[in-house]
């Protein structure tokens, strides 16, 4: 979920983007939606022109920073697409496949075209290990390891450009540290594009496992550079998702509210596996699975009453994958999930809300998971002595 990111200022900014803002520090690739805790905001990119700059700036002063002011009048938003003409003159457009974001930047003429890769910034978390390396004239790889609401969060990425990279200057926070490669706590890099082509396309593929898996995700899901094709495919996928319920009303406002709420309902749980089935577990081990898709971001104490029963009606193909994901988490941490987030257990909120979700799926006849195993895990989690509630 690629989106504009402002300066994080507390609880209201848990998802990153906030409509009250007028400053953008870049476009990040992982986000929460509707939560009361903050995290993610990984792999921040910021296009700009002119001299090399890496600083974020502050809310009351971004002079000399890479950040930019913006106006909502210059924004366009739709499921699967985001567009913003920033005050710095760069127009950014974003779309995505399941595991690969595609950026299209249109630069103003007359000065160097830059792209900041900022691995320090997130959404209320703390990066502790980051890495960037220029692989060739078009490719950069890296990772961002962080701790926040999730106690363990690792994002590897491969970035490919359609325009040649003239240079990659690397920085430890804002201190220059040479070119092409750096590992540290707060690594940043500035791409300078070769030539003066007005438009640059940038692919960013992510993985919880490795840079190699991120590259494999990119090759599997996005082998071409046709931005509009990817955008249209994303729109078609959202239309397919939202068309599972149709309403008949003359009240256009009510219809917008209904489908906006339905859109929000489909944002989480989130897909958490590579195209080959690999994913990183809560125990930091890599698991390989080819029979079901692994998911994370389960706000179970919020969702066991209504969202998961709704999925059994309108997304039955989804249900067994979710249950198998919960059973896999038990194998990783010896209890069913409480509030799992992208490779870590937050243990947020009391209770063991996975149990009624699994029971509901079983009683409704879903057979895509091992029922005996599920029952054992449900009983064990119900008497887990260290669990709150």
Locate predicted features.
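Accessory carbohydrate-recognition regions in carbohydrate-active enzymes
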Residues: 1-389
């Amino acid at each position: 979920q690629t989106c504009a990111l402002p300066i994080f200022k507390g609880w209201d900014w848990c998802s990153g983007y906030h409509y009250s803002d007028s400053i953008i520090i870049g476009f990040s690739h992982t986000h929460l939606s509707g939560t009361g805790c903050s995290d993610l905001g990984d792999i921040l990119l910021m296009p700009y022109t002119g001299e090399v700059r890496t600083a974020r700036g502050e809310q009351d002063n971004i002079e000399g920073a890479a950040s930019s002011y913006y106006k909502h009048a210059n924004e366009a938003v739709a499921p699967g697409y985001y567009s913003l003409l920033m005050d710095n003159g760069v127009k950014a457009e974003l779309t995505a496949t399941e595991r690969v974001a595609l950026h299209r930047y249109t630069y103003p003429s007359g000065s160097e075209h830059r792209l900041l890769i900022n691995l320090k910034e997130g959404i209320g978390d703390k990066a502790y290990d980051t890495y960037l390396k220029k692989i060739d004239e078009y490719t950069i790889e890296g990772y961002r390891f962080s701790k926040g609401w999730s106690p363990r969060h690792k994002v590897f990425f491969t970035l490919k450009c359609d325009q040649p990279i003239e240079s990659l200057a690397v920085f430890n926070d804002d201190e220059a540290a040479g070119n092409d490669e750096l590992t540290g706590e707060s690594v940043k890099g500035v791409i300078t594009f070769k030539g003066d082509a007005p438009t640059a396309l940038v692919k960013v593929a992510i993985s919880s496992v490795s840079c190699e898996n991120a590259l494999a995700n990119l090759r599997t899901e996005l082998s071409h550079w046709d931005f509009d094709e990817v955008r249209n495919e994303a729109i078609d996928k959202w239309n397919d998702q939202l068309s599972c319920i149709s309403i008949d009303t003359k009240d256009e406002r009510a219809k917008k509210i209904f489908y906006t709420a339905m859109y929000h309902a489909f944002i989480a749980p989130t897909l958490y596996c590579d195209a080959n089935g690999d994913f990183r577990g809560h125990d930091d081990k890599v698991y390989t699975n080819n029979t079901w898709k692994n998911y994370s971001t389960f706000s179970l104490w919020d969702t066991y009453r209504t969202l998961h029963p709704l999925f059994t009606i309108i997304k039955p193909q989804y249900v067994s994958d979710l249950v198998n994901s919960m059973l896999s988490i038990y194998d990783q941490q010896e209890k069913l999930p409480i509030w799992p987030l992208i490779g870590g257990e937050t243990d947020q909120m009391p209770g063991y809300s996975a149990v009624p979700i699994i029971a509901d799926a079983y009683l409704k006849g879903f057979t895509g998971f091992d029922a005996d195993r599920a029952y054992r895990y449900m009983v064990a989690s119900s008497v887990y002595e260290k669990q709150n509630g």
